[in-house]
């Protein structure tokens, strides 16, 4: 009997492809990684033939090999015979409807696979029917990735019916599809009575308010789900509020991701309020990281600090005292305040910076003085302070300090000590 390597070489000969050394070496290990190799339908046919009797490989990664429906059928035939492969990745292979049909039949018969990745294969609603049928007959598969496909309302109905009857699936990824309206509602209806699913990925769909209402009802009844991702689902304030109603009675969910939706701080506060009401909640992570919050939200969050392990990710705080902008003070008035507090006259203020007695102060020196003094805390920018001073504010009896669009401020001493009151309030 030929070994897997010899079988592969023979299969390459009859299919007209060049044997790949990476395949030959990988056939003796438990993991065979052939992603991005451009195998195509013929290349994967030769591989499938060599794997029919292989007992070593348990993980087969064929992502991004342009297998098309034909190649998908070859892999489906292989997996109907080989019961040693536990994990297969067929993502981004243009399998389309022909591949989905073959894989659906395979899932009905295979009792070894535990994880299947089928992301990005242009599957549509009719393909959901074939895949769901296979899943309803499967008693082993624990993890399925169908993200980045094109399932819509009918697809949601098929998968909802599957979830209501499937008793083994634990992780289901339907993110980046088009599940909305009746499809979203049907999927949630199936989730209500499901007793095995723990992780559900639904990010980047279109659940909106209708889907949020259905999900809230599912959260009230489901007792196994621990991870729910609903990011980017057009959920507004009302949707967040009804999900909060579901959280009031849910006792199993640990992670809820709701960022990149449409609700604001009111929706976020409703979620926190529900956690406050539900003393039996197991939630450990709440993601509302794109929601701008306020002090009221933070005060409500403080009341949940006794919840061990709870982490709430939120956006920036708008009206926190630490983030509020200081009230605007006209730059020249800010300098007046500084002079009055330190009992200085304007001339003395500038004279302290005129180290060489030239009566010309480098702008860089003026800038440093502003930044190092209390004036910095009063004025919005050093530049504004500089050019406010540049208005040639005349001191008493002809003294002046003027700034130009150059590198210096010119200072002229008045004939007699200036009256700061008259200068500051001309």
Residue ranges and their predicted role:
Residues 1-426:
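Leucine-rich tandem repeat or coiled-coil scaffolds
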């Amino acid at each position: 009997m030929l070994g897997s390597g010899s079988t592969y070489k023979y299969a390459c000969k009859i299919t007209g492809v060049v044997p790949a050394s990476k395949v030959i070496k990988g056939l003796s290990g438990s993991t065979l990684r052939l992603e991005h190799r451009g195998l195509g339908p013929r290349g994967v046919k030769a591989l499938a033939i060599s794997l029919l009797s292989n007992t070593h490989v348990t993980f087969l990664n064929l992502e991004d090999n342009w297998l098309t429906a034909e190649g998908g059928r070859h892999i489906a035939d292989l997996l109907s015979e080989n019961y040693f492969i536990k994990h297969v990745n067929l993502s981004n292979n243009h399998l389309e409807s022909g591949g989905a049909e073959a894989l659906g039949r395979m899932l009905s018969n295979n009792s070894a696979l535990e994880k299947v990745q089928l992301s990005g294969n242009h599957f549509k609603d009719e393909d959901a029917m074939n895949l769901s049928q296979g899943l309803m007959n499967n008693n082993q598969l624990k993890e399925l990735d169908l993200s980045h496909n094109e399932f819509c309302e009918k697809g949601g109905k098929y998968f909802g019916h599957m979830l209501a009857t499937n008793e083994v699936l634990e992780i289901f990824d339907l993110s980046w599809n088009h599940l909305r309206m009746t499809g979203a509602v049907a999927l949630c209806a199936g989730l209500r009575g499901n007793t095995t699913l723990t992780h559900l990925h639904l990010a980047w769909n279109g659940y909106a308010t209708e889907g949020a209402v259905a999900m809230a009802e599912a959260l009230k009844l489901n007792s196994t789900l621990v991870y729910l991702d609903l990011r980017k689902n057009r959920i507004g304030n009302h949707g967040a509020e009804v999900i909060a109603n579901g959280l009031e009675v849910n006792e199993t969910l640990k992670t809820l991701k709701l960022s990149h939706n449409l609700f604001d701080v009111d929706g976020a506060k409703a979620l926190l309020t529900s956690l406050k009401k539900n003393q039996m909640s197991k939630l450990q992570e709440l993601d509302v990281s794109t929601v701008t919050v306020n002090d009221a939200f933070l005060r409500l969050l403080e009341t949940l600090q006794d919840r061990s392990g709870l982490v709430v990710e939120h956006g920036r705080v708008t009206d926190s005292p630490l983030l509020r902008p200081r009230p605007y003070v006209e730059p020249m008035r800010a300098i007046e305040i500084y002079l009055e507090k330190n009992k200085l006259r304007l001339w003395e203020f500038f004279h302290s910076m005129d180290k060489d007695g030239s009566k010309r102060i480098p702008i860089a020196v003026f800038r440093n003085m502003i930044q190092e003094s209390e004036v910095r805390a009063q004025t919005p920018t050093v530049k504004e302070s500089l050019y406010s001073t540049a208005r040639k504010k005349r001191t008493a009896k002809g003294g002046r300090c003027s700034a130009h669009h150059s590198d210096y401020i010119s200072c002229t001493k008045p004939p007699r000590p200036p009256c700061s009151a008259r200068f500051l309030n001309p």
